[in-house]
């Protein structure tokens, strides 16, 4: 064993061993309990960032720990290769996106290997491989045949920068989730998958996800947005349009309905607009507002409306109800009806609209204590007791709902339904770099799937030029024009939303080389569901929703048996770093890398002045999420080259709880490296002392028992921290404390001392292995074990060692440690004082001093204060 710790040397050796022996490659073994650990699929953007490192280190710690428990552990890796960044890079460099993608994959693969992650590289997937996406195309056709796929022309979110459709989930604050460009709205034909048919299953399934974060489940519940309401048919007076179906959220307010409101896209609106120029103009102004409302972008817009000159009839009171078109009603809500019955006395939106256009307001609910509502300044929205409601007077809101519902059903004009905020998944994208949609258009206009025997429909290789940056597939005549049964047909030139590829990749990992189907059922059912999934909470209503949906689709066509894709989900927190900028002459913020900034701090450590490498006075913007936009990212390669992979892994897992934000401090990696060096040095000194004798359990002294107690208590704590609590930072803190305690307590005087130390060091190395596998591999070997640490089991606590009869007390004089004493575990304060006094009075320096105060911290320290 070398005297000094050189992390890069040992990491290369250990990684080569893992690579040569394919240590972490696995197959199905029904005699072993499986454990499938997976971190979310990375996009090959060119470089790993620290967010990647955190995600994958968490997964690797869990995987290695579970492997030491004797489980058959699958931890695969692959690449989410399609998407806009590759296409944008190809446009800039005038080349094919695959060149950029594969170059990035090679570099990022080297980065992952340099961190020592225990991946089964034989299962590596790349989603732009035709042998991967052929099964995605096949699956889409199966769903089409089952009636779960349809095509319709619809108003969509459109990103003018990327020239493509965005799903509702991909619109953030009115802008594209990638480039933040303000979205526009277009009507174009789109392919949809009926995720709404699975709304109940997606909602109810959340109750079975016991080990998912509540925040994620709440976000999904809200996105699915289940509510119960009633559709009621109203007759229309004096019109060739005879009826209208409207949505009513609260039937207890039914007797107070004073007008009806419909969306700008409602069929009645569009029909009347043909003969009403004012309404047609209103539609031209507001025809995108309702979809903005659906996307939660319409908060600050003023409510606008226009009267249709039509009246409906209240089916119970027979009151005439004016029908208005309003800009705040979405056609996508209320089961697609886009029409509501408005009771302004008891709904704030309706109240505001009624006041603006001087519409009738009829209160019909009073407070539960009988007080009449004051609706002068706002609506009264609480449930209560009905009045002003004919036969329903004096009923509570809850009771009235049932009575009014029965009345309307008896009249055969109402149907109570469950409604969802969730909309069908639009999967068409007007981009080149994606999976071709396997549909063709015949000469007679019929659209149908490509024959399954002709799959995959392979994306052609196209080089970008100035003339073909948009709709590049549609301009490729040789690809778009093909034949079917000896007739000319045209291919669909849209590609799939890239969330399609990432919705089923986890299942393909179970059988990546299977050529006869989408999944090999025995392998898929052996490994699935995933035991531990890891990724950011920002995916809660996009990837994690589609991921669950796809799993149920695959189950329902018989590919898999389980109901949910992952048993346990861990959402790691963001990584924050210092951020600096200066204002340029044109008033723009120029963000400066923290590596190029020199800062002056006050006594409290706060930054008071900063200058960059060019001499600019820069402004400290605080701790912000690491990002390219703020130029505050840290290159993992630079940290690995400077400190070694184990130190980086240690810091990432130690600096903060896994689910919390982590504040990046390079000094933290320096501290991790110092600890690993200390561990190396102590182990080196121990080994240099020669042969280790087997521990004699019958000749244990008090100090031995204390050390063994601490060691085996630490095993219990670290096991619980990693396994049940997933509190990895406290696990590492416990290991460090144990190491420090050993050094404090334990002078080495004889072979029994060395045997106890050997046991302690061996267990520390085992406990550290999931976190710092390279140094652990070498130290385990140097401690004399013939099997590699990769093949060892997790340490089991010796319960007898924990049940010690004595405890260690540190004796201090004026706060400085002088002695260690062992006292019976149940000793009272006076007994401990006497034993401690006898120990310290052996110190000649105390003879002329007077002890005037004794401070005792139970079971830890006794401190004698002298004059």
From Swiss-Prot:
GO terms for cellular component: cytosol. Its EC number is 6.1.1.4. PROSITE patterns: AA_TRNA_LIGASE_I. A motif ('KMSKS' region) lies at residues 625-629. Its main location: cytoplasm. The keyword Nucleus does not apply. A motif ('HIGH' region) lies at residues 42-52. Gene3D superfamilies: 2.20.28.290, 3.10.20.590, HUPs, Isoleucyl-tRNA Synthetase, Domain 1. One of its GO terms (biological process) is leucyl-tRNA aminoacylation. Keywords: Aminoacyl-tRNA synthetase, ATP-binding, Cytoplasm, Ligase, Nucleotide-binding, Protein biosynthesis. Belongs to the class-I aminoacyl-tRNA synthetase family. This is Leucine--tRNA ligase. It comes from Blochmanniella floridana. The lineage of its organism: Bacteria, Pseudomonadati, Pseudomonadota, Gammaproteobacteria, Enterobacterales.
